[in-house]
Amino acid sequence: MEDDLFQLRHLPVVKFRRTGESSKSEDDNISGEHEIQIGPVQTELEAVELEDGTTVPKEFANPTDDTFMVEDAVEAIGFGKFQWKLSMLTGLAWMADAMEMMILSILAPQLHCEWRLPSWQVALLTSVVFIGMMASSSLWGNVSDQYGRRTGLKISVIWTLYYGILSAFAPVYSWILVLRGLVGFGIGGVPQSVTLYAEFLPMKSRAKCILLIEIFWALGTVFEVLLAIFVMPTLGWRWLLILSALPLMLFAILCFWLPESARYEVLSGNQEKALATLKRIATENGAPMPLGKLIVSRQEDRGKIRDLFSPQFRCTTLLLWFIWFSNAFSYYGLVLLTTELFQAGDVCSISNQRKAVKPKCSLACEYLTVEDYTDLLWTTLSEFPGLLVTLWIIDRVGRKKTMAICFIIFSFSALLLFLCVGRNVLTVFLFIARAFISGGFQAAYVYTPEVYPTATRALGLGTCSGMARVGALITPFIAQVMLESSIYLTVLVYSGCCVLAAVASCFLPIETKGRGLQESSHREWGQEMVGRGTHNVGATPSHSGSQE
């Protein structure tokens, strides 16, 4: 009894308010502590009022109870075996996304020659994939917020696998145009793997882990180029499409293990499922669960686009849309531009060809050579140093400055393409540019899930991904069509766009470095109460203390 009284003396002074009772009273101006009278009368409490007059939700009405939220459990359990498995599984989906994107720069010149396609049809073949992604990104985000992250991810991956294999059997241009568009529709949901992944990560390792999962993207691009080197000269592009679907097939087989996000379960009212998921993670990691009861967050409408434009997120949403647009516009533009530059030999060769009086036939083509594939591989390998640089600076200078630095260095590297240099120096310039634009993309993937609350996290990431696809949709007409008119204007467009993106990064109103994931768009009472001495993390699990 004495211990209980000792604990109560050290708790914040609170006043209990009855249902319907005004929060203002005549005693508000009286200084000193308010006594808590406990009598036999049962009174329904709707809130607790702290000394500063702030109201706490009724689930915290008893300050002596041990309670915890999902964020507290994730922090207590930490990073372990479960997260390593999740990294590998969601990484497969990420790797497949990269391969489907990388295949565009390989497939387009091949079909240009084999089917004698004009340049605008080649550009359209690339753009239709991004049209599908743009149309579906917000939809998959809404599905993930409404029905669960796992559900949205599984459906999108199976969809992509089906139409990806089917497109290998396309007999004519119109068929492959439609089927690749449907592939793009499915790929629009793959970024939700980042949402699912981030919601299982403790705060101190979240940025590093999300960046490290980007290794699968880099591996996917490298694997696609290596696959093309061996498959294209012998088996052709149809087999390349089939073999490129292998990571998706492996994911579809293993996805039965994939758990639903505990944060999503709590927000949707499935407290028991969320608790079961947390216990599963604790068991696999060999870590104790926090003592007490799992607090259910206030249930909110999920997946509502209007929430992205609430006063607290309106500026963030608009700036992020432009940042994601610029990232994809420049990244995929550089991928396509690399192929064009390697085929020409250098920038000056392209410039001289444009000045020639002899008109250029739009059906003229050149197949990619082994040397072209090798140089493409070298620039693709730049994803790794770009990832390492971002990994090193993102927790030192913050997410916003990291994105700004990457955009500025990319812009400078792109301007170096104005110089008339040989193939080797050109490869170095492209290597640096690709390293930093991919680093900026990776930083955006860290920042976006961190800045939005659970109720709109998947939708926020989905709409940003959709805006990225708008940039990717436009970029073939810059990197492939405008290039025929002016290489210098093409490079200037990409460089200027990223300078503006760097400015936008600096003006983002929220820095998420060292910030926990927000469960709600409202004030996070669970996290505040933890610091008041009522939370017991890391204690030995107790059946009597934990909610079953």
Swiss-Prot record:
Q: Which residues lie on this side of the membrane: Vesicular?
A: 109-119, 178-180, 231-238, 338-373, 423-424, 479-486
* InterPro entries the UniProt entry points to: MFS, MFS_dom, MFS_sugar_transport-like, MFS_trans_sf, SVOP-like_MFS_dom
Q: Per UniProt, what is one Pfam family of this protein?
A: Sugar_tr
**What membrane topology was assigned to this protein in its record?**
Multi-pass membrane protein
- Keywords of this protein's UniProt record, alphabetized? Cytoplasmic vesicle, Membrane, Synapse, Transmembrane, Transmembrane helix, Transport
Subcellular location(s): the record lists: Cytoplasmic vesicle, Secretory vesicle, Synaptic vesicle membrane
Which residue intervals make up region (Disordered)? Answer: 519-548
Q: What one GO molecular function would you report for this record?
A: transmembrane transporter activity
Protein name per the record: Synaptic vesicle 2-related protein
Which organism does this record belong to?
Answer: Xenopus laevis
